[in-house]
Amino acid sequence: MSFPDITPSLKATMPDLRGRLLANQSLAELTWFRVGGPAQVLFTPADEDDLAYFLAHLASDIPVYVVGVGSNLIVRDGGIAGVVIRLAPRAFGEASASGDIVTAGAAALDKRVAEVAASANIGGLEFYFGIPGTIGGALRMNAGANGGETKDVLIEARGVGRDGTKHVFSNADMKFVYRNSGVDPSIIFTSARFRGEVKDADAIRARMAEVQSHRETAQPIREKTGGSTFKNPPGHSAWKLVDAAGCRGLRVGGAQVSEMHCNFLINTGDATAHDIETLGETVRARVKANSGIELHWEIKRIGVS
């Protein structure tokens, strides 16, 4: 599927734009599942000012989506009408530490932020070492693992609104809840500051090694997967509910529930986005029938079928 090319008209209305605009760009290679259709427009801003300029001049009726490293995302097979914004690591991927503060761009890998903190003897951010995403996604979904969450360490976040206005959000402003934040979904996060605590370097490294070991032994990290598929319902582990419903190893087309960790869906090689989403919905239905508990997607799904 392809969409009408609107990049010439966008460029005409944005003469000072410095970032890159691409029409009908495939998104499959930008997601960990390696599935999905094209973006009508893929925009990579040069920096925060360029992002703000673009949004301020973009017609309000054009939908906008953000894609990071695509680790917790399904792009549907029909692609995405409108604009997909990808914050490139070169412009938004820096991470640095000073005292007990870590500053990171929204495109910085969570794992990289943990490493920068550890190099400065800053503890408290080790949990990021086991999360395969970026800081932008961590801010949006209050990412957490291994006993830590973004809400525990965030000082403030910067972002740009749909109208191009820049914003700064305190921890309280973020209105964090389990695997979500209360900030307007149209805000595109650009950077954040975190506070840890100065600790013994060996203790920090040991904790990070534990986190990595857990990932390697308990999760299918070498597969084409989107990470944790469903949120844990209060008082329950999603994977246990999926397992109890007899879904371990269940397949739809080229998509399969992981044998190693059944809260992970994997692309066995030739899956479509439809296969993966259908499998997820099948699992949800079986869990509901077996336990009466409704699972909610943790993976974001965007685009048209």
Curated annotation (Swiss-Prot):
Gene3D superfamilies: 3.30.465.10, UDP-N-acetylenolpyruvoylglucosamine reductase, C-terminal domain (3.90.78.10), Uridine Diphospho-n-acetylenolpyruvylglucosamine Reductase, domain 2 (3.30.43.10). Its cofactor is FAD. It is an enzyme of class 1 (oxidoreductase). The keyword Cytoplasm applies. Its EC number is 1.3.1.98. GO terms for molecular function: FAD binding; flavin adenine dinucleotide binding; UDP-N-acetylmuramate dehydrogenase activity. GO terms for biological process: cell division; cell wall organization; peptidoglycan biosynthetic process; regulation of cell shape. Keywords: Cell cycle, Cell division, Cell shape, Cell wall biogenesis/degradation, Cytoplasm, FAD, Flavoprotein, NADP, Oxidoreductase, Peptidoglycan synthesis. PROSITE patterns: FAD_PCMH (PS51387). Residues 34-199 form the FAD-binding PCMH-type domain. The active site is at 179, 228 (proton donor), 298. One of its GO terms (cellular component) is cytosol. It catalyses: UDP-N-acetyl-alpha-D-muramate + NADP(+) = UDP-N-acetyl-3-O-(1-carboxyvinyl)-alpha-D-glucosamine + NADPH + H(+). Pathway: Cell wall biogenesis; peptidoglycan biosynthesis. It is found in: Cytoplasm. SUPFAM superfamilies: FAD-binding/transporter-associated domain-like, Uridine diphospho-N-Acetylenolpyruvylglucosamine reductase, MurB, C-terminal domain. Belongs to the MurB family. PANTHER family: UDP-N-ACETYLENOLPYRUVOYLGLUCOSAMINE REDUCTASE (PTHR21071:SF4). Cell wall formation. This is UDP-N-acetylenolpyruvoylglucosamine reductase. The lineage of its organism: Bacteria, Pseudomonadati, Pseudomonadota, Alphaproteobacteria, Hyphomicrobiales. The gene is murB.
